[in-house]
Amino acid sequence: MSESKRIKTALVSVYHKEGLDEIITKLHEEGVEFLSTGGTRQFIESLGYPCKAVEDLTTYPSILGGRVKTLHPKIFGGILCRRGLEQDMQQIEKYEIPEIDLVIVDLYPFEATVASGASEADIIEKIDIGGISLIRAAAKNYNDVIIVASQAQYKPLLDMFCLLYTSPS
């Protein structure tokens, strides 16, 4: 991500919410807007911060029992849009796609579900499609988007924000 660009919009969609509150608070303090899915959106709102539902942006509901939530051009276009390419910028303007500058996502606990002896049906539902797609899209556009793909990356992100956005006294 370019040094001078501030994060305006963060897509947050996580299974594990522990430790997320500190990140959300810091992002909110810096004026970052949140875009999220069901449970994560409710978590962010429970902290007292506004959060736009993915469904409001896409104008499409979560379908197939929650299997399809973020797989939409208005989400992936906002992540994959190359900010320095005029053609990309014209297209996102034409289709009213917001730039997404930060993606915070983690994957369903597939291995833990398998190890728990869960049923095949439960195991299959823990195969994450949207989460891994978001990670790959953000990684592909690493020049313009920051990706946080696990709880282990929350502290480094928080440290980065403290360095970038805290004025020396």
Specify the residue positions occupied by each region the protein language model found.
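Structural motif
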Residues: 8-11, 32-33, 52, 76-79, ...
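Conserved active-site and cofactor/substrate-binding residues in soluble primary-metabolism enzymes
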Residues: 5, 18-22, 35, 39, ...
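Conserved small/polar residues in nucleotide/adenosyl-binding loops
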Residues: 165-169
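N-terminal glycine-/serine-/threonine-rich phosphate-binding loop
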Residues: 2-36, 40-52
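A short, charged helix-loop
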Residues: 105-125, 129, 133-164
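Short acidic, glycine/serine/threonine-rich loops at helix termini
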Residues: 22-23, 45-49, 56, 63-66, ...
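Glycine-rich nucleotide/cofactor/substrate-binding loop typically near the N-terminus or early
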Residues: 39-109
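Gly-rich Lys/Arg/Thr-decorated short loops/hinges at beta-loop-alpha junctions or inter-strand turns
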Residues: 3-7, 70-76, 110-119, 139
